[in-house]
Amino acid sequence: CQVKWKDNSPQANYYDEYEAYEWKYTEKGYLFLEEYHPPGFDGAPGETGFRVQPLDKTCRELNRKYVMPLGYALNNLLITNWDNQNYTELDFYDLYEKMYYMKYGKQVPYEANYGGAEYEVPEDEFEEVIKTYLPFSNTEIEKGTFYNSNNKTFRYRPRGLYDCEFPYEPYPEVISYEKLQDGTLKLTIEAVWEIRMLDQAITSELMIKPMEDGSFQYLSNKVIKSDQNANAGWYMPRLTEEEWEENYSNN
């Protein structure tokens, strides 16, 4: 049963009934159910998770404002150790796409195609998006990308057939927070991965700097190792230069 709140009351707007193949209740307070599928079934996965134990209201609000807009899909910011000194593992192209939507409410205006599309994005456009949410200078952004200093553009290749991502990624959940003396926020985030029936697939500490005008920046992320953590197998890195040439050079 899918329930949404309306006028401070729960309203059921979808109902389904099925035989549970497996179920699990976690210490954290999640109930996971797996729908039975016959051998050979190739449809959508049947795992569903429900949080039974209520989550702190402030944690939910912080999650909605700072974490859910980025999430775990098509970027590695929440699954990578990074700060303003060590950031080489971040993929600025992934973050450009995600943060463009966060900033403007629409997708980047550069479409992928079967033959491997390639664009030259003006430096002001690319850097403005990244610098809105991350504390990096123009020089640092240029070092982590393919930047053409002659025409002041960034080479941008949308993801395509060969680096598309697994569709059933986890969703983030802020489980605790701390406001530091300098005004920054430290959020402890756990990944709830329904298809693996895990409520702590990845745990990390994300540092955020809220601004007076309501905007914010991500400052760093630290992955917390745990026996309950899983490999972030949903994330697909973009093609390397060699892989891109191998797959698209003849198109």
PLM regions: where:
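Short, solvent-exposed loop/turn segments at conserved positions within beta-propeller repeat blades
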Residues: 14-16
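Active-site-adjacent structural elements in enzyme catalytic domains
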Residues: 128, 146-163, 192-194, 209, ...
